Regions:
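Conserved motor-region signature of P-loop NTPase helicases/translocases
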Residues: 1-73, 148
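Conserved helicase C-terminal RecA-like lobe
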Residues: 27, 58-169
Length: 169
């Protein structure tokens, strides 16, 4: 009646490329103003908070990988990949220092101690660790949502589902 939008899901932008700097600036502006952006085929997937947090937490479970990054052992990685992984690890560390994430921190620390001395194989895969990770906050909260809400509100859950497909294959 008033002509004002009541649901941001009523808005759609169509661009030739979501990689264009102007499109990225618009997406950043909208998200800084608490308007979620959904772009299913963009490189933005790996820039999402929940994706970086998962990857950082997974890496913290394997301290030898982190040592390898710090020592420059992975010469096959491009500098931007090393920077990205470090960013994920720093985000995970920041998140784990928050008191509300104490249980997650304790669990990851336990796994890190187990994996640092690992000599053989385990009876679980990366995907198994990922699903266990989802039992802890903040991931449990991201996944405990009403699936009948708008697409922008379920993006973290959708991204975690997509990441579980990637890791599980």
């Amino acid at each position: 009646e008033s002509g004002k939008l009541t649901d941001y899901n009523q808005i759609a932008f169509l661009f030739n490329s979501v990689k264009h700097p102007r499109v990225r600036v618009l997406a950043d502006f909208l998200e800084k103003n608490h308007i979620n952006v959904y772009s299913p085929r963009s490189d933005m997937f790996f820039q999402r908070y929940e994706v970086q947090l998962v990857l950082g937490c997974m890496m913290l479970m394997f301290p030898k990988y982190i040592q390898g990054l710090e020592n420059g052992d992975y010469t096959y990685l491009q500098p931007e990949h090393i920077t990205y992984y470090r960013k994920c690890i720093m985000l995970a560390n920041e998140t784990l220092t928050q008191p509300r994430n104490a249980e997650l921190r304790k669990w990851i620390r336990h796994l890190g101690k187990t994996h640092i001395g690992l000599r053989g194989t385990t009876d679980y895969a990366y995907s198994g660790l990922l699903y266990q990770l989802f039992a802890y906050e903040p991931f449990a909260g991201m996944l405990d949502i009403d699936m009948n809400v708008g697409v922008t509100d379920i993006r973290p859950a959708r991204n975690l589902a997509k990441l579980s497909q990637i890791i599980g294959t």
